Amino acid sequence: MEELKEYSCVILSDIGANTLLLPSATFARSEKRPNRTKLIRDYVREGGGLIMVGGYLTFSGVDAKGKWHDTPVQEVLPVEVLTVDDRMEHCEGVTPKAVKPHKILEGIPEEFPDVLGYNKTIAREGAEVLAEVEGDPFIAVMECEKGRSAVVTTDCAPHWAPVEFCEWEHYGLLWKNIADWVTKSE
């Protein structure tokens, strides 16, 4: 935990829970190791920031292999992770829209560039949904005891985030605002 506290924020993107739950010492040699999902949960509760970004192994992901639903990290996320494959593929593009004013969205237009997919989630009680896509959370945030968490349910890079999203003039500001909010630097 002390090493984790050296950082203001943890960002999880395109990583399944098993990456943290099955370190090589445990998987290959059956050795005990700290549960890193518990460490992240406790880190957030004690004042750290957490951002989860969508992708094929984030949230529940492809074939539900992300497996974040039943982990301690779920306790500090502003959304409920599904137990089934949660990928919402939209090759035609779908437009995320801001639905609630918040510091994270300062300087950001109400409509975002289209995305080509996202992870379907359900907002948790106590969370604030700041932007939606197809009626689902796109950006959601939550206070978690002394810390904060945020989710962006699409990827930060292709294929779900096409060029027009990644090169959007507000792209950098959006991520800066999210990081500033979860780290209480705003």
Predicted regions and their residues:
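An acidic, glycine-rich "communication" segment
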Residues: 49-136
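A general structural signal for short secondary-structure junctions and capping/turn motifs
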Residues: 1-2, 42-43, 65, 119-123, ...
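Alpha-helical scaffolding within the catalytic cores
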Residues: 1, 38, 134-138
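Stable alpha-helical elements in mature extracytoplasmic
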Residues: 3, 36-39, 69, 171-175
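Extracellular ligand-binding/catalytic regions of CAZymes and related secreted enzymes
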Residues: 124, 128, 144-148, 154-186
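Short alpha-beta junction capping motif
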Residues: 5-62, 143-148, 152
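Sec/Tat-exported extracytoplasmic proteins
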Residues: 11-14, 44-48, 77-81, 178, ...
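Short, conserved loop/turn and helix-capping segments at secondary-structure boundaries
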Residues: 30, 34, 67, 165-172
